[in-house]
Amino acid sequence: MKITVIGAGSWGTALALHFSQHGNRVSLWTRNADQVRQMQEARENKRGLPGFSFPETLEVCADLAEALKDSGLVLIVTSVAGLRSSAELLKQYGAGHLPVLAACKGFEQDTGLLTFQVLKEVLPDNKKIGVLSGPSFAQELAKQLPCAVVLASENQEWIEELVPQLNTTVMRLYGSTDVIGVAVGGSVKNVMAIATGLSDGLEYGLNARAALVTRGLAEITRLASAMGAQPKTMMGLAGIGDLILTCTGALSRNRRVGLGLAEGKELHQVLVEIGHVSEGVSTIEEVFNTACKYQIDMPITQTLLQLIRKEMTPQQVVERLMERSARFE
């Protein structure tokens, strides 16, 4: 199958590498013309994922029309902020009918829409829209280390066809029709990872980390259920699986945000040092707004938002959470 990957960050590049190494032709496209030239010349993404050479089956395209030609699937792997404009480009290039998966995680700012909802709004006639989510770091996938992720869509028949087509010995795919649950789990875990990094950076220990991960899962489950998801989805790869990896993994950008804030650094400085998008930061406010809309209590999210707004110190965030009134779990 010909697969088009839009977005050449670390995750987009890792997916392009993976699928091109497992029987697919892949076209990788990004808006950044300088980055396209660099990748074409070096046959490597030295900016987004250095150290991994591109196989012959991976084509880097400067022309989106060429990248979309004969494609059977489009993966949009931009930041969430770039998702809508990428979907608009599909329409503009006459490719709005192609099957499309959002492989980014978060809520769209201002609208509060999940990624698949953005795609449905831009491409209302497309019946093959879904998300790819689950516990997976780009570096490990590029090294061909095993992982398991979820493909979710409201279109069950399509997912049943797509999963065996994309399944490999390195990336085990599971299908789901609970696209809300999969999308919410992948989005809100980024917020919880910042909180866990904050606690670890303050050296509050493993007990505190376990408490944050567990209560974070409770917050995610409450919100997802209120939005129409199946609670059991939060017990799977897109829920607790992604949460554990992002909260504890050394490669987690969102965890690194929390660690940086615990050192007393300004948020801007932390993000510059990381050098990549941290969706958790841009997601916090939309998650909190959505929780308010559904009247869901999300104390970890709320206190983190106050930290980002400089209304609290890192120490006060943890103190506030521990001072909450006693209750049954």
Curated annotation (Swiss-Prot):
The keyword Oxidoreductase applies. NADPH binds at residues 10-11, 31, 105, 138, 253, 277, 279. Its EC number is 1.1.1.94. Pathway: Membrane lipid metabolism; glycerophospholipid metabolism. GO terms for biological process: carbohydrate metabolic process; glycerol-3-phosphate biosynthetic process; glycerol-3-phosphate catabolic process; glycerophospholipid metabolic process; phospholipid biosynthetic process. The keyword Protein biosynthesis does not apply. Its main location: cytoplasm. InterPro entries: 6-PGluconate_DH-like_C_sf (IPR008927), 6PGD_dom2 (IPR013328), G3P_DH_NAD-dep (IPR006168), G3P_DH_NAD-dep_C (IPR006109), G3P_DH_NAD-dep_N (IPR011128), NAD(P)-bd_dom_sf (IPR036291). GO terms for cellular component: cytosol. Gene3D superfamilies: N-(1-d-carboxylethyl)-l-norvaline Dehydrogenase, domain 2 (1.10.1040.10), NAD(P)-binding Rossmann-like Domain (3.40.50.720). It comes from the Bacteria. It catalyses: sn-glycerol 3-phosphate + NAD(+) = dihydroxyacetone phosphate + NADH + H(+); sn-glycerol 3-phosphate + NADP(+) = dihydroxyacetone phosphate + NADPH + H(+). Coiled coil: none annotated. It is found in: Cytoplasm. Keywords: Cytoplasm, Lipid biosynthesis, Lipid metabolism, NAD, NADP, Nucleotide-binding, Oxidoreductase, Phospholipid biosynthesis, Phospholipid metabolism. The active site is at 189 (proton acceptor). Sn-glycerol 3-phosphate binds at residues 105, 134, 136, 189, 242, 252-254. One of its GO terms (molecular function) is NAD binding. Catalyzes the reduction of the glycolytic intermediate dihydroxyacetone phosphate (DHAP) to sn-glycerol 3-phosphate (G3P), the key precursor for phospholipid synthesis. Belongs to the NAD-dependent glycerol-3-phosphate dehydrogenase family. This is Glycerol-3-phosphate dehydrogenase [NAD(P)+]. It comes from Neisseria gonorrhoeae (strain ATCC 700825 / FA 1090). The gene is gpsA.
